[in-house]
From Swiss-Prot:
Subunit structure: Forms a complex with TatC.
Species of the source: Anoxybacillus flavithermus (strain DSM 21510 / WK1)
Upper lineage: Bacteria, Bacillati, Bacillota, Bacilli, Bacillales
Swiss-Prot/TrEMBL GO biological process terms: protein transport by the Tat complex
UniProtKB keywords: Cell membrane, Membrane, Protein transport, Translocation, Transmembrane, Transmembrane helix, Transport
NCBIfam families in the cross-refs: PRK14861.1, tatAE
Superkingdom of source: Bacteria
Record bears the keyword Transmembrane: yes
Membrane topology summary: Single-pass membrane protein
The protein's name in its UniProt record: Sec-independent protein translocase protein TatA
A GO MF label: protein transmembrane transporter activity
PANTHER family associated with the record: SEC-INDEPENDENT PROTEIN TRANSLOCASE PROTEIN TATA (PTHR42982:SF1)
Length: 60
């Protein structure tokens, strides 16, 4: 889904976020979003690794 957003779309999102939250809150929100995204990727990687490991065990 995010791969369909181009540079103009990202700029528009940032401008809207700046207007809504203000310049002081924006870094805090970005940091929280980054940490959440990192944790989500870590969880999905762990789940994928478990599934692949289980499939490898079933093949043997």
């Amino acid at each position: 889904m995010l791969s369909n957003i181009g540079v103009p779309g990202l700029i528009l999102i940032l401008v809207i976020a700046l207007v809504i939250f203000g310049p002081k809150k924006l870094p805090e929100i970005g940091r929280a979003f980054g940490e959440t995204l990192r944790e989500f990727k870590k969880s999905t990687k762990g789940l994928r690794d478990e599934v692949l490991e289980e499939l490898d065990e079933n093949k043997k």
